[in-house]
Amino acid sequence: LVRERLFEHVAHTHGLDPLQLVIEDTDIVDTMGPLRISVSEASKGVKIVQTFLHQHRKTEELDENGQGNCHVAFAFVAHRAVVDVDVELGLVKVVQIATAQDVGRSLNPLALLGQIEGGIAQGLGLAVMEEIIVHNGIVKNPSFTDYLLPTALDAPNVLFIPVEEPDPQAPLGAKGVGEPPCISVTPAIVAAIRDATGVDLKRTPVRPQDICL
């Protein structure tokens, strides 16, 4: 909306059609003529006030069992994991995660990638590292010395393909992107380990003794 108002201002000032204006880097450019003016210069003295109200559509009613669908937007994602496994020591290195994900509309590509990589790191932790060990009601690994978290050294190479399917009922068509990787990265990694070792893995995280014993 701000961009449209700014285009209208520039078009009125220079006698142009606002539909032929685009933003390139930090400039407003006339696609049909020579005009190129910085956004900061074009916005000097311009006051734009815009109020926008968005309300999510209502979620479904609960059924007779007290259950219902609380989601207002759905995102779809696929993951493929590549792992190196030392079958004698039971050690696993997640080498690469390839993923394609429905992101709605990408509003900030760099932040989007950060969300994807963060979700992948969480899923990796659940797959091969993070576990609270309890014995007789006592947590045996109460510190980060014993409770292992993924670090930058554990992070795999990520191949990410965003699929933009804007949600027509969400602000700017955006969807949540950090949560889906947390869900499907874990089974992708476990499936890759199972394929590499032939071991029928039935729990997470996958421990060395699950592989080599």
Identify the role of each PLM range.
Residues 1-213:
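C-terminal catalytic domains of large/alpha subunits in multi-subunit enzymes
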